[in-house]
Amino acid sequence: MRGRRQEDIATTSSAPSTSTSHKKKTVSSNGSFRPRTQSNPGGKMEMYDHFYKNFQRPPMAPVYYPTSEEFADPIEYVAKIRPDAERYGVVKIVPPSDFKPPFAIDKEKFTFRPRTQKLNEVEAIVKEKHTFIERLVNFNRYSGLQFEFPVDRDGNVVDLYRLHRIVQNFGGCEEVNDEERWRDVAREYLPKEQMTRGVPSYFINLIRAHYNLHIEPFNRNLKEKAMKNEDESDDELEELKHKYQHHHGTMRSEPENTDGKNTEDVEEECPMSMQSGRRRSKNKKPVPAKKSSNGTPKKGSRGKKNSKTEEDEEENEDVIEQVYCVSCNEGKDEDLLLLCDIEGCNSGRHTYCCDPVLDEVPEGEWRCPKCIESEDAKIGLDWGFYDAETEYNLNTFTEFANKWKCDYFGVDNVSKVSCDALEKEFWKNVVSHDNPVAVKYGADLITSRVGSGFPRKEDKHTGPDSKLKQQYANHAWNLNNMPVLSESVLSYFNTGISGMMVPWVYVGMCFSTFCWHTEDHWTYSVNYNHFGERKIWYGVGGDDAEKFEEALKRLAPGLTGRQRDLFHHMTTAANPSLLRSLGVPIYSVHQNAGEFVITFPRAYHAGYNEGLNFAEAVNFAPIDWLAKGRECVQSYSNVRRYLVFSHDELLFKMIEAMDRLGLSTTLAAYDELKRVIEKQKRLRQFIAQLGVPARNVEQVAFEKIPDEQRSCRFCKTTLFMCALICNKHKRMTCVEHHDHLCKTCTPKDYKYQYRYEIDNLTHLFDELGKRTVDTAGWQEDDDDMYTQEEMPKLEPMVDLYNVEEQSSSRQKNQVHNIIAIQHTAKSAIEKANQLLFKKVRTRTKTRCQRADTRTDADGVKSLIEQMQGMDCNLSGLIDKLQKFLDQIDAWRSKAQIMMSQEHKYSKDDFEHFIEEGDEYDIKLSEIEELRKVVGMKEWSERAIEITSWAPTSNMEKDIDFEYKMRYTNKDVIALIREGSRSSSNHTSQLIAKLQHMLAEANKREAEATEYFDNPSLDKLQSIWKNLRTSDWFYEPYINLVRFEIGQIAKIKSMIDSTIPALSGLDLKPQLLRLGDSSITFAKAVELSKACELSKTLHKSQEHSSLLELINRMNLFTERIAKLFKPMNSYHNLFEIVSERDDLTPLAEGQVLQLYYQGETINSGNEWHQIKDFDSLEQMLHHQSSLREMQSRIFEKVKQTNSARGLEGCCCLGGNKSDSSESVLSCIMCESQFHVRCCEWSTFFQHLPKGCFMCVRCLRGQRPVIDDVANALNGTPSGCMETHLVRNLIQKSRIITQNLMDCSNKRQSGEVASDEMCKKALFDWLACEIMNPNGLPKAVELIHEFFGDYLEKQASAALELQQRPVKSKPSASLFDPKLNSKRKRPNPSQKDSSKSKSRKRQGQISPIDYCEEETEFKSCQARSCLKPFGDSVNWVMCDAGCKNWFHVICVGFTLREINDMHEYRCSSCLDHADSPASSVSTE
């Protein structure tokens, strides 16, 4: 066992964004309004992290302490506390001290197999991420796509779920593609510390390519599935999901096939068998579905997979078999036809008909979309819960559980772990990836098999405590008895229902959990902790159930969206603190041994165990549940969940026993039957209108049919009152879902079955009515007795009591009132104790204790007088009551003083004083008066907040300018009306000011309305001067003007960095001068979109000027692309025209993947890297720095490439077929390539034969310098894109002149070393513009310096020139996946794999990104190459100096560094006495 783990847990990269925007008025608890606010949409997914790392416990639910008399009847006591307790969802009841039932189980003989729970697989947010990843992998795998998790240059696995959520927050893949926002997506994804030098281009290309190839087809498949008609149910899938409903209801047996799957469904649905078909090799022809000779699909045809029966052969012996594609319905291209690998599925598709399209027949398994969907639906159904083989008894499990907890927390006794520490640790564990925790839980053990913790009536009670066992075997709170108490409607079932009427027991250990759920049929439940440590509960009141469901949908939309009945599976946990932050009221209960917990109808509840314990639970259903139960049936029908029992059947079982029903039960059954009759009349009228023939109507005793054979095939409701039948296909639905019964038959073919004639129902209704009248007579007599002015005599009360005892109606409340009057003295003592000792007995103030039963100060006096008049001696209790009354009088006196001098006291003072008064728990009229004072103080605060509102000088530039809290006309009127109740001078002054401000604001609203008749910038500035003073006002047209101002301010802030201007909102000069400024295309587009949102600027002169600028920039991009970009380009224009930024990682030996750019030219994509620069000066300085670095590092690149050999080819050495003569070496970087992996460039025609440049060194087509200069004519002079091209032209002229000077000096005999000439030649070859003036000199020098190279490569170069151009370019180059088949990394283990693959990089410097002139100074190499860029890697000396070095400065590649056991620098090697394990060359 391990010790306690560390605190820091990486949790919430998987959490979805849930921020929403709203402008509606919110109401506080006291009914007053709050100013509206607007949240920021699209928040980060890490926003929930603190809820798990620093868990905040929800408030505690009430604890109830019944007296022995109250405890005698559990149903009545629950009914008594229900008005107050129900809103908490779950409450605790502590029984009287004399309730000590013996534990009736032999711990040694009690054996069970607990299930294993993996805590980090049950939390909703984490579970959604894991589910998404597994579904994505399965979809790609079965769709025939080679899928691997993308890895960035640092070896980090890209979090695809997080990437998916970010793309969805940006509007989805289509919008991101259209709006060219992949850079924004990457920026959102990458950590902030990696943004110092912008977003790496390779990463943008990586995520764009992977998303479009693997994730978007998966999302598209989900959308298409959602758009299909969801009306048809998938019976097999529903049964599968039903098995994973971890509810207390009995597991349904497998239903018989009543749906006729051998008919039309064969055509519609693909079988869900999980048996895999035979694997297909690449050369094997697939055998898809077949057609008969007339072109129609053959039913039952299975291709080569099927073993035909003799009947099939006879039926089809004359049919000519033909394979065909179910998408295009064609049988051509049989070698490209795929057959689903699921045994028994006929579905076939061409590779080019698949979505996504497949380039070739896949080697692995391929499944049709329907079978993929079937597999997809099963993912995640039972995650987190696994069956175990180890069997325990209670003693051995106790030993295991206690040892596990002690080992985990590092203590020697389980009692030494605090509740708070354990609770915080639990919520960290549910999201822990680094240290997953698995525990065991003996859950849902049925007592009929393993035994109950309570003695049972049917058990044999022996031993010295046999009488005690017999006593508790009959106790009302014995969970074996509660469901069948006469007041529980479940008692009318003749047989028990496992988990509902027959208890289940639970053996828990530390952290074992039960996830969020409601009870079956929304019944009550009761749980008793027999022994052991605490059980922690969280509850949500039934009235807040929909809030809970909506919150969980926001947190995990992927889970709730794919499972209609997610909330009926006990498999999903969610953080209560997080749910509370989303507006869900949640309360907590700590259940100790010997305590009961009650859950109320539709109350969601969840929790965990602090350690070993043994609990028992069962359901019960008082009469008030009946209406909730019917509502539940409708809810189950909506999500197509099976019922545990038929609600209507239960009702009629009660009606059959009407002689035994009490008044309240009779009334409830009467109301329910009335609804049933009304519904049946409507349905039978509808059946006649539907066209079901009268001869097809029959009466059926549904209760005699097994439940699984009388369920609606669509909504799964167990039918009892009526049903529709399709005789031909043996199908059944409820009348409401008649349109899902059959697709081929008509209502004339249907059969309508019903349980009761309408006359029978009416008769039963009348009989129930008579019984309500009889019992009502008893009620009237009882009421008359209590309304008499004189105290009723004892004799009539006893007579009335005897009448009720002989009756079957059991009017318990009235009988107890009679008994209470008979025991007046006892009642008075109980009242006194309740007043004096309430804090001990209730712990929390609840309405149950203070609503109907609370007395006032006069009542306390009367009680004292009553007790003084009794014949018994109660002086001690009377003295305590008198002291209590004196305290109340003192409090009331102080209340009068505070109200008369309220200006001296703050609102908090009054609130604290009110709390003191509430502690007395009696009616005090002063409390209401004090609350009014508090209300007026709150009113003053809100009024002052408005009246003190003043505009600030630059408020328009505030980030939250548009979203500040403001007030509507109705808000202020309501505030004025509320304040008018007070007559104080202070209030009157505030009201007058509010009225004046409101009048002025309404005038401004009228002015704002007129503005939009003819908006303009000039008018906007003028009107805003007046409106600024009423900025507090929130009305439609002022809001619109405010939006316009905010939009103008945003646009101005975007332009100010480019074209500084004076303060104010005048944009005209700036917008009209944009063409001359250093603006980028991306910023121009962003400005245009901002203008389109503004009614003032949209289609204005200024906007038209901006659109013209964008059009000119697009034309410029098209001209430049035509000159520079080859037909199959793997670089965008920026990467071609700019200096190279890939030299450092290449020198380190990293593999940099290149992605095909596509045929279309998009200005946003071609120049998107320019976004990273804040100014033109910064961009040009960056270009200069890259150019300087190139001269320092390129030799290192050559050394690395030479050492790699053909591993540097774009196939990464995977192509072994070419001979040595078919290999080309790049004249510049010396990387080697197979000829078949290369492309011919027209630029090679200008160079000597045999001269070759690789795809990295020759990125463009090398246009002539004059053509490029001409392309700049008419382009915006100041745009950064044009400056970048001009910079390249200028560079070309300089290096060409330098080349010519070196060559001329060499020819004239002047000093011009070979190295100088080689460098000049290198610079000329590296420039992406060809200057013809330098071409002859370059050719001359190439012949002189590289003669042997040209001769060696002549044959391979000729082969390249003669080879035809590829018709379809590769999607990517230098792709590791094309070189080897690697095992797919497990997302849950990505952190550990990362640390392993970066053994040396794990120590790589804290400087993730090198700045250009500064950060390289920290490198301690003797000759630092001064690299910088996005991915400069460092290594630390493992010897004594601990200095840091650039990897490329120490003479090793990154792979070599990672493979070293340790690294020692040269300085440490010089001082070492023994040989080092590695050598340094820095």
Swiss-Prot record:
Residue spans of biased composition, Low complexity class: 11-20
Amino-acid positions noted as binding Fe cation in the UniProt annotation, renumbered to this chain: H517, D520, H605
Occurrences of domain JmjN (ranges): 61-102
Zinc finger PHD-type: from-to: 322-374, 1206-1260, 1416-1471
Co-factor requirement: Fe(2+)
Domain JmjC: 471-637
ARID domain mapped to chain residues: 126-223
Keywords: Chromatin regulator, Coiled coil, Dioxygenase, Iron, Metal-binding, Nucleus, Oxidoreductase, Repeat, Transcription, Transcription regulation, Zinc, Zinc-finger
Catalytic activity: N(6),N(6),N(6)-trimethyl-L-lysyl(4)-[histone H3] + 3 2-oxoglutarate + 3 O2 = L-lysyl(4)-[histone H3] + 3 formaldehyde + 3 succinate + 3 CO2
Protein family per UniProt: Belongs to the JARID1 histone demethylase family.
Purpose: Histone demethylase that specifically demethylates 'Lys-4' of histone H3, thereby playing a central role in histone code. Does not demethylate histone H3 'Lys-9', H3 'Lys-27', H3 'Lys-36', H3 'Lys-79' or H4 'Lys-20'. Demethylates trimethylated and dimethylated but not monomethylated H3 'Lys-4'. Involved in larval development and vulva formation.
Name of the protein in its database record: Lysine-specific demethylase rbr-2
Gene behind the chain: rbr-2
